[in-house]
Design a protein with these regions (language model features):
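Short coil/turn segments at beta-strand junctions that form active-site/ligand-binding loops
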Residues: 5-6, 81-83, 122
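Metal-dependent nuclease catalytic cores in nucleic-acid-processing enzymes
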Residues: 65-82
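Conserved phosphate-coordination/catalytic loops
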Residues: 60-66, 107, 143
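RNase H-like nuclease fold core
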Residues: 1-65, 77
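C-terminal functional segments of enzyme domains
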Residues: 18-20, 36, 40, 87, ...
Length: 163
């Protein structure tokens, strides 16, 4: 398998601002459905189709957390030789990069994004999703999250193929 093969997911992204934490990032795509990942609490802004589903203030729902972890683990367990990429819009990426809270564990992730993009000359709308998988997961949740992760990768390959 070509080591540079990629699973590409094209989305219409929007940002869900976090309160005292990293931001939610909400993506909507053909193969993933609507997913949110991030921590903290916030209210949704963006297309009305997503507002209707995510417009809320308060903690992330269990469903959002599960889908968030499926993205993390989907990247971690991506088939050998593949790299997962998410293409989205400038506003989402820029806001994610600016949402750095030193007292939050996610703050250093935002800083790594800045450095990675600077080092590789990546355009703002291009984000490599594998850098979302930095956290360890509670052991009792691995099985379900991993199942969702593998399913996500299978669907990405099925729906989009490789590029």
């Amino acid at each position: 398998m070509n080591s540079t093969s990629k699973i590409r997911v094209y989305t219409n992204g929007l940002i869900v601002e976090g309160v005292g934490a990293y931001a939610y990032i909400v993506l909507e795509s053909k193969n993933l459905g609507t997913i949110g990942f991030g921590d903290g609490c916030g209210a949704a802004f963006g297309p009305s189709s997503l507002k209707s589903k995510f417009a809320q203030s308060g903690p992330a729902t269990d469903e959002m957390r599960m889908k968030m972890r499926a993205v993390y683990e989907g990247v971690r367990h991506c088939p050998d030789g593949y790299e997962v990429e998410v293409y989205t819009d400038n506003f989402l990426v820029d806001t994610a990069l600016r949402t750095t809270e030193p007292n939050q564990e996610d703050g250093d992730i935002a800083e790594r994004y800045r450095k990675y993009i600077a080092q590789h000359g990546i355009k703002p709308q291009f984000i490599i999703c594998k850098h979302y998988n930095e956290r360890d997961l509670p052991a009792n949740d691995h099985d379900e999250w991993n199942w969702m992760a593998y399913h996500m990768c299978e669907k990405a390959i099925e729906d989009y193929g490789t590029h």
